Amino acid sequence: MKLKTRILPFESAHYTVVLDQSVAKKLDVRPSDRVLVRFNGKTVVAIANIAKEFSHEHVGVYVNIAKALGISDGDEVEVEATSPPASLQAIRKKLQGLSLESDEIYQVVKDIVDGKLSELELAAFVTAVHFQGMTPSEIYSFTLSMVETGQRLRLKRKPILDKHSLGGVPGDKTSLLVVPIIASLGFTIPKTSSRAITSAAGTADRMEVLAPVNLSIDEIERIVEKTNACLVWGGALNLAPADDIIIRVEYPLGIDPFYIPSILAKKLAVGSTHVVLDVPTGRGTKVKTLEEAKRISQSFFEIARMFGMNLQAVATYAEEPIGHAIGPALEAREALIALRELRPGDLVDKAASLAGTLLEMVGVENGYETAMEALRTGKAEKKLREIIEAQGGDPDVTPEEIPLGDKTYTLYSEEDGFVYYIDNSLLANIGKIAGAPIDKGAGVYIHVKLGEKVRKGDPLLTVYSSSSAKLQAVERILEDSKPVLVGRTAGRRMLLERIQYQPPRQLVLER
């Protein structure tokens, strides 16, 4: 059936069209059935929404279909009913608790990327994987399929180093130090990062204060060839695109069953050969104990080895924010200060520990000291400024030139004592309520660290925002909640333990 297009100002994870009920009846299409949309030799499979009072001469198409087919408003397209996607059978199989074969997994991932699965079908699949789990073979196949259904960065150099953090600790701007440290020593480290989802700033948000991060594959390859590195947003690159679609379903459900293929697929897509996996460990983070950190790391080791990837996991101290700053502009400022002045100490220590681990993975002796030397000599700072310039930013920017929110609120200590507890999740939430990361100048500056002595009236934290209303919302929260508590605590080290791979033990049943 030939219909004229009406482009609707909506976009979804899957392709969607709107048909009048009279048109749907002629096509024998019911709600959520699939239709084939054809235009100028191109086709997409879309999910049909049925409307009661829509033009019977038109088909409503979402923006992503218009982009995929090159459609303009009023163009004539061919619409016909088509069969359900092949991957539905695999989804039903997983719901029954059965393992999937590699070809079934590829079909599921392909249908996700092609927009053939509805959000309901995708949610059912994600939930099934969450409750049924995956075998190592399934995780391997999902990782491989995610890579194969997206673009890849093809750099003509080896080795390629990389880092990834499981997150959960506020203010973790270590990538802004680790990347230039590694690159300044002649190694390649193309860092693709995410924007904040549940935190006040992701690495891409922090770097965007200093330079554009929404770059193409060609631009990234050129920048890496010139500087050995980049710090860019991965969401613009179509690397493992199935992951971005799955995350949209995982987030409202509060589950994350694909975290291993998600992380490894994006590392494989940029060609990473050596990866340090940062596992922040402590109260208020995703990983609470060293035992849990070791268990999670073993799963990563097993899958990484299947791909020939050299992966080293490290559990890092995460009982408090890294450094003092939370929020894009505040953290970008602090990263520049750390590169020049080697403070705050915990940020510098963690960055040198992660960079040092990577360096030792490629044969450099005394990795930590080598990383510190790159900081002390100014090589790392110079390299970051080269990367900033290559990505289109101002290489001469100073911390003081980075604007912050002009509305502030400071919380003061009500007593003498020692800081004995800092609530990571509450601080991250305060940063978001203040407007971060959308408001780049919003965030929280923590004046104190665990174990520090404070006097009554000393500042504990300052909140920045560009909105008076948002700052007032923060003040109301701080009337009832205390993100910083006073008491006594012991000292701490940033690097808790390097976790070693352990071959799986054979299970022997007693007879």
From Swiss-Prot:
Summary of the function given for this chain in its UniProt record: Catalyzes the conversion of AMP and phosphate to adenine and ribose 1,5-bisphosphate (R15P). Exhibits phosphorylase activity toward CMP and UMP in addition to AMP. Functions in an archaeal AMP degradation pathway, together with R15P isomerase and RubisCO.
Catalyzed reaction equations: AMP + phosphate = alpha-D-ribose 1,5-bisphosphate + adenine; CMP + phosphate = cytosine + alpha-D-ribose 1,5-bisphosphate; UMP + phosphate = alpha-D-ribose 1,5-bisphosphate + uracil
Homology family: Belongs to the thymidine/pyrimidine-nucleoside phosphorylase family. Type 2 subfamily.
Binding site for AMP: G168, S194, R195, A196, I197, T198, S199, T203, S262, K286
Signal peptide start and end residues: none
Alphabetized SUPFAM superfamilies for the sequence: Nucleoside phosphorylase/phosphoribosyltransferase catalytic domain, Nucleoside phosphorylase/phosphoribosyltransferase N-terminal domain, Pyrimidine nucleoside phosphorylase C-terminal domain
EC number: 2.4.2.57
Taxonomic lineage of the native organism: Archaea, Thermoproteota, Thermoprotei, Thermofilales, Thermofilaceae
GO CC entries: cytosol
Organism annotation: Thermofilum pendens (strain DSM 2475 / Hrk 5)
Entry annotated with the keyword Chaperone: no
Protein name according to UniProt: AMP phosphorylase
Example of a GO MF term: pentosyltransferase activity
